[in-house]
Regions:
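N-terminal Rossmann-like FAD-binding beta1-loop-alpha1 element of flavoenzymes
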Residues: 4-42
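Flavin (FAD/FMN) cofactor-binding and adjacent substrate-gating region
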Residues: 82-117
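C-terminal helical "tail/cap" subdomain of flavin- and related membrane-associated enzymes
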Residues: 349-405
């Protein structure tokens, strides 16, 4: 492997983690980020920094004990700055609820922080690295190959030479289609487990601020509150500075009319508040006496998740995927941040070793680091009794009273 600069495509969590770790191992690295927006200069803007390339950033993100451990061990300055900005650490145990899938919900020290705050800190840390350059508004448009391996990345009509690049373009990035265009066949990916695979979902999210520190309700899921109510789920995810996020997840094609037509009113502030207030596990959190909303309702539709693997990265030598580009898990499992951090750090470690002359299978090392995290939920979603989707639809339609107390 030559000593030219490494390229990272995408400045999200996985991309910047990879880039920071590469730079700190002495590898010069350029990050190509299609979004032109740069991080706000002041700390006050951290909580409201939303990038077009991360439409899901408004959702509640769980930074599990494994995520926290990675930060403490490998990026302690990032963790320190997050805590200075109001992120919270707290000890959690396994979920008390029943989980019908894999049973390894995590225990340990977790981190409560909003995704925009995390993104802001990570970008600021990256921009201070002497060997790292973030190019905002530089959209990669294709790949160039020579002799059967990567030789460069296209940015418009220009070619940026590279013998190694990291695909951190996310779950629905363009790299796979670029490889199709170059004639590199797709490799078979693992068949989804019908018991755990997602069919896609609609997400409705709103952020609240508590009037005082603490939790007004039980965190019955360890890292969150709420649960799975059959045709939908609803969770409270604690965050920094006494804020929290409430998120409804409505699976695509859900039975009993739980689809868009009946629950679409969740996208309105009044409908969202009424629905959240009708769920006993959530009601205490959104009680106006305890908290007030600080954002509108964000609606987002995600297609079915894609189960990746090491074989999916073997299409073109010199190109390795990290984060969601490597493996897109069901958002309900809350393992995305851990996979992004672990795969990025493993990639940097393997690339650095290869540049030092070791014989390293970079793709295999990256997948090994992510595989265990991708296979199990960080936060189980307990099956709970509560309003059905039909009950929720009636609340949204205004035909049922909102329970009080």
């Amino acid at each position: 492997m030559s000593s030219s600069r490494a390229l990272v495509l995408g400045a999200g969590v996985a991309g910047l983690t990879t880039a920071i770790a590469l730079a700190r191992r002495g590898v010069p690295v350029d990050v190509l980020e299609r979004d032109a927006a740069t991080a706000p200069s002041g700390r006050r803007g951290a909580g409201s920094w939303y990038r077009d390339g991360a439409p899901h950033a408004g959702q509640g993100h769980v930074f599990s004990p494994k995520s926290h451990q990675v930060l403490a061990d490998e990026l302690p300055d990032v963790l320190r700055q997050l805590l200075e900005l109001g992120a919270r650490e707290w000890s959690v145990g396994p979920s008390a609820g029943r989980w019908d899938g894999p049973t390894s919900a995590e225990s340990g020290t977790a981190l409560a922080v909003r995704r925009p705050v995390f993104d802001w800190v990570l970008r600021r840390v990256a921009e201070r690295e002497p060997l790292l350059r973030v190019h905002s508004g530089a959209a990669a448009t294709g790949l160039q190959t020579s002799g059967g391996r990567l030789s460069g990345v296209l940015v418009g009509r220009a070619v940026v030479p590279a013998d190694f690049a990291v695909d951190a373009t996310g779950a629905f990035g363009p790299v796979s289609s670029w490889l199709d265009d170059l004639g590199h066949p797709r490799l078979a990916e693992p068949r989804p487990d019908p018991d755990t695979a997602s069919t896609g979902a609609d997400f409705y999210t709103r952020c609240y601020a508590l009037h005082w520190p603490g939790e007004p309700g039980e965190l019955n899921l360890g890292l969150a509150a709420g649960g799975d109510f059959g045709d939908y789920s609803c969770r409270v995810v604690p965050a920094d500075n006494n804020t929290f996020t409430v998120m409804f997840t409505v699976p695509a094609g859900a039975p009993n009319g739980a689809g868009e037509s009946r629950l679409a009113p969740l996208s309105s502030p009044d409908g969202f508040q009424a629905a959240a207030s009708s769920i006993p596990a959530i009601a205490d959190w959104v009680d106006p006496a305890a908290a007030e909303p600080i954002t509108g309702v964000t609606s987002l539709r995600l297609p079915p998740v894609r189960r990746g693997g090491a074989s999916a990265m073997a299409r073109l030598p010199g190109l390795v995927a990290v984060g969601d580009a490597l493996h897109t898990g069901d958002p309900v499992w809350c393992s995305g941040m851990a996979v992004a951090l672990a795969s990025g750090l493993a990639c940097a470690s393997a690339v650095s070793a290869a540049r030092d002359g070791e014989t390293v299978d970079v793709a295999a090392r990256v997948w090994d680091a992510a595989a265990d995290l991708a296979a199990y939920p960080a936060c189980a979603c307990a099956r709970m009794s509560g309003p059905s989707a039909g009950d929720l639809a009636e609340v949204l339609a205004g035909s049922a009273p909102v329970p009080v107390g």
